[in-house]
A protein has these predicted regions:
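Conserved beta-strand elements of the Class I
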Residues: 35-36, 91-93, 134
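A glycine/threonine-rich phosphate-anchoring loop and its flanking beta-alpha core
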Residues: 112-210, 219
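Catalytic cores of large soluble enzymes that bind and process phosphate-bearing ligands
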Residues: 10-14, 43, 69-72, 184, ...
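N-terminal small/polar loop signature for handling phosphorylated ligands or for N-terminal nucleophile
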Residues: 43-115, 229, 233-235
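An N-terminal, well-structured beta->alpha segment
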Residues: 1-64
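Active-site segments that bind and position negatively charged phosphate/pyrophosphate groups
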Residues: 202-237
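Local beta-strand N-terminus motif with an aromatic residue
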Residues: 31-33, 89, 170
């Protein structure tokens, strides 16, 4: 029986790994200007400096796109797509939670294309990779950094819909537990439970494979062993 597993091309991990990893990626991709996708909550918490400081040290130009609300609509994504198209950036970096990463993933297949988000809702296979992307998640549980789908709201139908296209899988992912040190324990716990829901879903899926089950079981053990009272300890947060 044939099994398939789709994951990001390159994964960097480790506490404090953002600075060295992002410089390595920029040099590898020969990027001249980075388009940084984030939100006002991240900026207000002072977390974005973990990314901006190494960009400044490296002398890399960047532009910040932070006008993103939770669960953005397809219109919100089109707005930020137009803003990105007016920029000369050549690498996308998503620094945030699921909504930020989903928007960035969509722009990575929209920028400079002749199709819209509504076109992708009708026919996701239209999407083609337009820009390389880097995902730096700031919460434990969305999993958007590792998937080929993105969720957008469709206000006129009062629903949320998913767009699935393998071209949206980030080219690079940086997992740095230092990012979640400033998060309230309640947020870490809530997103940790979200992560647990994902591994349970993975294990019980009709499309589960021996390889995906291995990851799901390992993930469940890490979460169960670290999410309770010790969630405030940095070592436990890193495992979650």
């Amino acid at each position: 029986m044939k099994h398939q597993l789709m994951i990001p091309s390159v994964l960097y991990t480790g506490v404090g790994s953002i600075a060295e990893s992002i410089k390595e990626i920029i040099e590898k991709e020969q990027a001249k200007k980075v388009l940084v996708f984030t939100d006002q909550g991240i900026i207000g918490a002072g977390l974005l400096d973990l990314l901006l400081d190494p960009l400044k040290d490296h002398g890399t130009a960047y532009e910040i796109f932070s006008d993103l609300r939770p669960e953005p609509s397809y219109e919100d994504v089109e707005k930020i797509r137009r803003q990105a198209e007016n920029s000369e950036g050549d690498l996308i970096v998503a620094f945030g939670g699921g909504s930020v990463m989903d928007a960035a993933k969509l722009v990575s297949i929209l920028k400079g294309s002749d199709y819209s988000v509504k076109d992708l809702l009708a026919n996701p296979s239209l999407g083609r990779k337009q820009m390389k992307s880097v995902a730096i998640p700031t919460t434990c549980g969305t999993g958007s950094e590792a998937t080929c789908n993105a969720i957008v709201a469709v206000p006129e139908e009062e629903v949320k819909k998913g767009i699935v296209n393998t071209a949206m899988i980030p080219d690079y992912v940086i997992l740095d537990a230092q990012v979640i040190k400033k998060l309230p324990k309640s947020i870490v716990a809530a997103t940790g439970v979200d992560a647990l829901a994902h591994v349970v879903e993975c294990y019980t899926s009709k499309k589960a494979t021996p390889l995906s089950n291995t990851y799901a079981l390992a993930g469940a053990k890490l979460i169960f062993g670290n999410i309770r009272e010790e969630i405030g300890r940095a070592s436990c947060r890193e495992r979650v």
